[in-house]
Curated annotation (Swiss-Prot):
GO terms for cellular component: cytoplasm. Heteromultimer composed of HisG and HisZ subunits. HAMAP family: HisG_Short. Its EC number is 2.4.2.17. It comes from Campylobacter fetus subsp. fetus (strain 82-40). It catalyses: 1-(5-phospho-beta-D-ribosyl)-ATP + diphosphate = 5-phospho-alpha-D-ribose 1-diphosphate + ATP. Keywords: Amino-acid biosynthesis, ATP-binding, Cytoplasm, Glycosyltransferase, Histidine biosynthesis, Nucleotide-binding, Transferase. Belongs to the ATP phosphoribosyltransferase family. Short subfamily. Its main location: cytoplasm. It comes from the Bacteria. InterPro entries: ATP_PRibTrfase_cat, ATP_PRibTrfase_CS, ATP_PRibTrfase_HisG, ATP_PRibTrfase_HisG_short. This is ATP phosphoribosyltransferase.
Length: 203
């Protein structure tokens, strides 16, 4: 049996839809249940940010998670396949009236993704003070907490509604299929079989 960690929300639904196509059967969580066993799979409904931990620690053999989360957590997992679901971008946002001035002695950047942010500005040799927030990132430049933000952008509507614009794109992200390294050895045939079936559906 393969244990599969899925993120709550739209990505889980779209991933289960892929399984439904592969096995010609309905894969669906019952209301409020966090686990589902079906056709030699156990599915776990997990917070997106926790999936790399579940897979790294072996609580799940494989998982589906955004590339941005993988890069932020820098987890020791195998990246098997880009599922091309949940496409988005990690962007730098600033006020409409501002420009991003890389020559400032230190830029203050508010974000939920401190590691991606730190690595990006270090690669540009720009001094940045990272301000870790857990929500309402768009407020930070408006109230003077930061010069800019780093956040996930899907359509850009939230930024526009809050008087912000995209100043730069750090990376593009989409959901990836990942595997625990030990599981890939002990359950190699099962994982590769599933990999090929998923690949044939999405490509």
């Amino acid at each position: 049996m393969l244990t599969v960690a899925l993120p709550k929300g739209r990505i889980a639904d779209e991933t289960l839809n892929i399984f439904s196509k592969i096995f010609n059967d309905e894969f669906k969580f019952e209301d409020r249940k966090l686990t589902m066993i079906k056709d030699n799979f156990e599915f776990l409904m997990v917070r997106n940010q926790d999936i790399p931990t579940y897979v790294t620690e072996g609580a799940a053999d494989i998982g589906v998670v955004g590339l941005d989360v993988l890069e932020e957590h820098n987890c020791d997992v195998l990246r098997l396949l880009n599922l091309k679901l949940g496409k988005c971008k990690v962007c730098i946002g600033i006020k409409n009236s501002d420009t991003l001035d890389y020559t400032k002695p230190e830029l203050k950047i508010a974000t939920k993704m401190p590691n991606i942010t730190k690595n990006y500005f270090a690669s540009k040799a720009v001094a940045a003070k990272i301000i870790k927030l857990y929500g309402s990132i768009e407020l930070a430049p408006i109230v003077g907490l930061s010069d800019a933000i780093v956040d996930i952008v899907e359509t850009g509507t939230t930024m526009k509604q809050n008087g912000l614009k995209v100043a730069d794109i750090i990376m593009e992200s989409s959901a990836h299929l990942i595997a625990n390294k030990n599981s890939f050895i002990t359950k190699r045939d099962e994982i590769l079989s599933l990999y090929h079936k998923i690949n044939s559906v999405i490509n």
